[in-house]
């Protein structure tokens, strides 16, 4: 079988949901708001394809730096490099 290099490769177990969590997320996850400077966790919701960050950022925590359209811009520290990630609110969870 040919080797494919899609954006969701190697995510068979990483993006898998629990049985009762399957299906579309609640509307409250779509309309959640964040403050600039707030810490958020990146938890990719595999049932929503729009605004999905890259799989390497799944499980990381970033700081909100602004909004771009319906998505939020975050800064992430990847080793010594500071990276900007753009993700929709369905894939973000506020840090408690």
Swiss-Prot record:
Organism domain of life: Archaea
Gene Ontology cellular-component terms listed: ribonucleoprotein complex; ribosome
HAMAP family in UniProt: Ribosomal_eL21
Family annotation (SUPFAM superfamilies): Translation proteins SH3-like domain (SSF50104)
Matches recorded under Gene3D superfamilies: Ribosomal protein L21 (2.30.30.70)
PROSITE patterns, per the entry: RIBOSOMAL_L21E (PS01171)
Organism of derivation: Methanoregula boonei (strain DSM 21154 / JCM 14090 / 6A8)
This protein's UniProt keywords: Ribonucleoprotein, Ribosomal protein
Similarity comment: family membership: Belongs to the eukaryotic ribosomal protein eL21 family.
GO terms, biological process: translation
A Pfam entry, by short name: Ribosomal_L21e
Protein name as it appears in the record: Large ribosomal subunit protein eL21
A Gene Ontology molecular function term of the record: structural constituent of ribosome
Any coiled-coil regions, as ranges: none
Highest classification ranks of the organism: Archaea, Methanobacteriati, Methanobacteriota, Stenosarchaea group, Methanomicrobia
InterPro entries assigned to the protein according to its UniProt record, in alphabetical order: Ribosomal_eL21, Ribosomal_eL21_arc, Ribosomal_eL21_CS, Ribosomal_eL21_sf, Translation_prot_SH3-like_sf
């Amino acid at each position: 079988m040919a080797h494919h290099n899609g954006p969701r490769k190697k995510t068979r177990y990483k993006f898998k949901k629990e049985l009762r969590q399957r299906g579309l997320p609640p509307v409250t996850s779509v309309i959640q708001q964040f403050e600039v400077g707030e810490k958020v966790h990146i938890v990719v919701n595999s049932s929503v394809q729009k605004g999905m960050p890259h799989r390497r950022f799944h499980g990381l925590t970033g700081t909100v730096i602004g909004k771009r359209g319906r998505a939020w811009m975050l800064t992430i520290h990847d080793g010594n490099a500071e990276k900007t990630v753009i993700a929709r609110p369905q894939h973000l969870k506020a840090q408690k």
